[in-house]
Amino acid sequence: MTAALTAAPTLPPPELRDCPAPAKLNLFLHVTGRRPDGYHMLQTVFQLVDWCDTLHFRRRDDGVVTRTTDIPGVPAETDLIVRAARALQQATGTRFGADIAIDKILPMGGGIGGGSSDAATTLLALNHLWGLGLPRAELMRIGLALGADVPVFVFGENAFAEGIGEELTAVDLPDSWFVIVHPKQHVPTAEIFSDECLTRDTPLSIIAVFAACTNKFSFGRNDLEAIATAKFGEVARALEWLKQFNQHARMTGSGACVFARFPDEQKAQQVLKRLPPEWDGRCVRSLARHPLAAFA
């Protein structure tokens, strides 16, 4: 009897364009402790929104990974995009490489996860383009080594996060419109987390308490906000400006972006039209799932 031949897996076309890397908002962010290795223990809820960088990938057969777009201040060798691609190569032993271009829209140092989201989109897109078929949990493990915010973008859903941000539970959040204000000030994450005045003992909450909250957008607080607004005056000014329209406005991540939820797009656009000209702002809509969630 002739043995049946096993066909090699069929690869997708060599080019994958217009891959979104969405921003995230931290609806609250509690610092609950600090590990011996220096990482902070957190509780937060991640909300994905439709403000995105866009990445483009072309498969190579020689194993070379290149970033074809220049990003001022970010050398290709240290870029999370390139590091993510190489981490995926190392984890799988694939012979493939990639040319990667990016339309960089999300501000760096904004607290909206731009670099982490770019890394996650790279992992998801190349998992597909290289025909690897890795499960989501494995991509999340690879992503965690790149940064604590990478796993939630690979996870692909809005999530209640614990640990250093990698212990994720999906949460249902209402369809929402937000105004995000970027006061054009770069806030270094390490500077905020290392500040001696940072509170690191916020009591633990449980997901059921958040789920039962009638207004999930006023739950808790951002423990990093007081530090960032004391150090960076434009962040403080932007937050106070936005609180004119929604008293529950708050900072996302370690800043510099601040945000508030509004009843509908019309109201959000009305607020955005009053934005002081020295700042950038966006009207964005919530996402229920990551646009590339099907790639894992």
Curated annotation (Swiss-Prot):
One of its GO terms (biological process) is terpenoid biosynthetic process. NCBIfam families: ispE, PRK14608.1. Keywords: ATP-binding, Isoprene biosynthesis, Kinase, Nucleotide-binding, Transferase. ATP binds at residues 107-117. Pfam families: GHMP_kinases_C (PF08544), GHMP_kinases_N (PF00288). This is 4-diphosphocytidyl-2-C-methyl-D-erythritol kinase. Its EC number is 2.7.1.148. The active site is at 24, 149. It is an enzyme of class 2 (transferase). It comes from Cupriavidus pinatubonensis (strain JMP 134 / LMG 1197). GO terms for molecular function: 4-(cytidine 5'-diphospho)-2-C-methyl-D-erythritol kinase activity; ATP binding. Catalyzes the phosphorylation of the position 2 hydroxy group of 4-diphosphocytidyl-2C-methyl-D-erythritol. InterPro entries: GHMP_kinase_C_dom, GHMP_kinase_C_sf, GHMP_kinase_N_dom, IspE, Ribosomal_Su5_D2-typ_SF, Ribsml_uS5_D2-typ_fold_subgr. Belongs to the GHMP kinase family. IspE subfamily. Pathway: Isoprenoid biosynthesis; isopentenyl diphosphate biosynthesis via DXP pathway; isopentenyl diphosphate from 1-deoxy-D-xylulose 5-phosphate: step 3/6. It catalyses: 4-CDP-2-C-methyl-D-erythritol + ATP = 4-CDP-2-C-methyl-D-erythritol 2-phosphate + ADP + H(+).
